[in-house]
Design a protein with these regions (language model features):
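H/E-rich (His + Asp/Glu) clusters that bind or coordinate divalent metals
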Residues: 5-90
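Basic phosphate/pyrophosphate-binding loop/patch that engages nucleotide-derived ligands
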Residues: 1
Length: 90
């Protein structure tokens, strides 16, 4: 599904933190699918994610990892003060 657009909530959970291990498994140890067109990190950076996190450092990391064009504002509760999110990505 090359045109499928994915949104992973809450800064994509732990994926940005373990994607280096996934890349290593696929590219160095030759485990997993053999016909990937791109590395796991490239696939992960092509998704969209929301910036719902109570930790400003996590929001900043998401901004650096995904880039501002892949971050979405969303809310299911006033969990994080919007001012914190704006301050972190400004």
């Amino acid at each position: 599904f090359p045109t499928l657009r994915l949104v992973c909530p809450h800064l994509a959970g732990t994926l940005p933190y373990i994607v280096g291990r996934l890349d290593h498994q696929v590219n160095v140890l030759k485990r997993g699918p053999r016909n990937l067109a791109r590395s796991p990190v490239e696939y992960l950076k092509s998704i969209w994610t929301d910036v719902v996190s109570p930790l400003p450092l996590a929001i900043k990391f998401g901004h650096e990892f995904f880039g501002p064009g892949r971050l979405l504002f969303s809310s299911d509760h006033p969990w994080v003060e919007p001012e914190v999110i704006v301050r972190c990505v400004s």
